[in-house]
Amino acid sequence: MSRPSSRAIYLHRKEYSQNLTSEPTLLQHRVEHLMTCKQGSQRVQGPEDALQKLFEMDAQGRVWSQDLILQVRDGWLQLLDIETKEELDSYRLDSIQAMNVALNTCSYNSILSITVQEPGLPGTSTLLFQCQEVGAERLKTSLQKALEEELEQRPRLGGLQPGQDRWRGPAMERPLPMEQARYLEPGIPPEQPHQRTLEHSLPPSPRPLPRHTSAREPSAFTLPPPRRSSSPEDPERDEEVLNHVLRDIELFMGKLEKAQAKTSRKKKFGKKNKDQGGLTQAQYIDCFQKIKHSFNLLGRLATWLKETSAPELVHILFKSLNFILARCPEAGLAAQVISPLLTPKAINLLQSCLSPPESNLWMGLGPAWTTSRADWTGDEPLPYQPTFSDDWQLPEPSSQAPLGYQDPVSLRRGSHRLGSTSHFPQEKTHNHDPQPGDPNSRPSSPKPAQPALKMQVLYEFEARNPRELTVVQGEKLEVLDHSKRWWLVKNEAGRSGYIPSNILEPLQPGTPGTQGQSPSRVPMLRLSSRPEEVTDWLQAENFSTATVRTLGSLTGSQLLRIRPGELQMLCPQEAPRILSRLEAVRRMLGISP
């Protein structure tokens, strides 16, 4: 038999390699299944409790293990018999909620715990495996990669149909390039008057962004806790804000991509990179704030969007967030961005639709990203008011919110302290003269000066355009015009603007604050603040003693206009958090740095 030619060998090798690469990834390893723990019992509340249970059983010699094959195929995590290859159990890859590794903790030295949602059953279970051959760390990494590939390779289809299971079928979509997406444009289908049609038109992105369409039903509207605000909801305005927020995020990503390319060219030609392509720390902070603000907007719009769902946009934002974090020059900068805190609706939305890798990314950002306003135990963050690169401003707020989209406070109009008509009798109109012969007409005489109407803020409100006014809970305001649902008010700093009337309550005579006392529970920073007031503000914000000593000698004007580079030199450890706080104060006061 003659030896095959070199060309024949090459062609056979080429065909062999092409066949291998065209086949779906098949992960298959031999493991030892130790036990499965149902979570939610009195002793097992999470993966750590399951491991502790294993340690106890191992010490007592009660572990009944079984060797088997752990395999990933066609989007399923399968447990197979070693000899017959019979399927013993299986779970959807996207039902995996967490994976943890425990090394050298007992007689089993390489344990992988996988927490999954049981198919068709409520609650979760934790499976424990001894990974002697492959190693728990390596197997965890392989499973995470398989899960990411599975999420990316789903066919791009429409949203979930009624009755369609969230995790089965083609509901999850493959990554959608940003150049194929469009921005929101309001449009109400006639057959569904309370649903919105959402379209996107985003500029080209350096990376494709994933899409996802599953979401759970939103919870019923409830009155927010007294210490936090629930901004009156107007979906059309929220859509407009979201449009511009997403556009600014994309613009920042484009700048980041250009900066990265510039850095690569400098490295190629041996030049030193002295900057980040013109991107400042404040720009990174602004982008992180806008991403958080987007989550809050999507939480409010979750039941309003139709064709493009809120979870789809959440996945787009997380892809963008991952892209930005990978290129951020300061690793912990995002975790220090506190304002704006997420709303409970935003938290619920993220919990309902994030994939395991996205959930890990989210949790890794810390409490400032994972704690809702209602559960935040730190210092009260200052209100967040976004500014836009194109100087776009919102139109005047509408007088009524659409049906099905009323704000939580307005749903409680039965309370006598809420509502625009329950505070005091409405004034009579004076837009005409008395009619001749009217027995009630009397010669006009100067009217005594009416005392200024004082109100107290029940819930904080963030201004969304120059016509509105940012207020905080407990602030005392003077009402200038209360003829409409949105009232014109003036704060003690002399700034005036519109706020919704249903976040106010009457200020009774003799209430502290009626004589010009400070309306805030914490010291306020203003341009006119003296050094001792700046010191009080820094201490109230829980900055370190060194920071208070360094910056406490400045006036409010000096601190609010300090440059990021100067602040970095003076307070290198806390500069990011100080910048974030100062930016929030600037927005509230309506000043530029």
From Swiss-Prot:
The places in or outside the cell where this protein is found are: Cytoplasm
GO cellular component entries: cytoplasm; plasma membrane; ruffle membrane
According to the record, mutating A8T results in: In HYPT5; uncertain significance
Keyword S-adenosyl-L-methionine in annotation: no
Instruction: Tell me which Gene Ontology terms the entry assigns under biological process.
Output: positive regulation of ruffle assembly; regulation of hair cycle; regulation of Rho protein signal transduction; Rho protein signal transduction
Name the CDD domains on file: PTB_EPS8, SH3_Eps8
Q: Which residues carry this modification: Phosphoserine?
A: S231
Bias class Basic and acidic residues marks the residues at 425-435
Q: What segment(s) does the record annotate as region Disordered? A: 149-171, 184-239, 374-451
Query: What are the alphabetically sorted keywords of the record?
Result: Cytoplasm, Disease variant, Hypotrichosis, Phosphoprotein, SH3 domain
MF terms (GO), sorted A to Z: actin binding; guanyl-nucleotide exchange factor activity
- What PROSITE patterns is this protein classified in? SH3
Q: Where is the PTB domain?
A: 28-155
Q: Which Pfam families match?
A: EPS8_2nd, PTB, SAM_3, SH3_1
Q: Where is the SH3 domain?
A: 450-509
Its main localization is: cytoplasm
Q: Which InterPro entries match?
A: EPS8-like, EPS8_2nd, EPS8_PTB, Eps8_SH3, PH-like_dom_sf, PTB, SAM/pointed_sf, SAM_3
Compositionally biased intervals (Polar residues)? 386-401
Quaternary structure, per UniProt, is: Interacts with ABI1. Part of a complex that contains SOS1, ABI1 and EPS8L2. Interacts with FASLG.
* Assigned protein family: Belongs to the EPS8 family.
The record names the disease as:
Hypotrichosis 5: A form of hypotrichosis, a condition characterized by the presence of less than the normal amount of hair and abnormal hair follicles and shafts, which are thin and atrophic. The extent of scalp and body hair involvement can be very variable, within as well as between families. HYPT5 is an autosomal dominant form characterized by little or no scalp hair at birth, wiry and irregular scalp hair in childhood, and sparse or no forehead and parietal hair at puberty. Eyebrows and eyelashes are thin, and pubic and axillary hair fails to develop.
- Give the protein name, as stated in the record: Epidermal growth factor receptor kinase substrate 8-like protein 3
- The species this protein was found in: Homo sapiens (Human)
Lineage, opening ranks: Eukaryota, Metazoa, Chordata, Craniata, Vertebrata
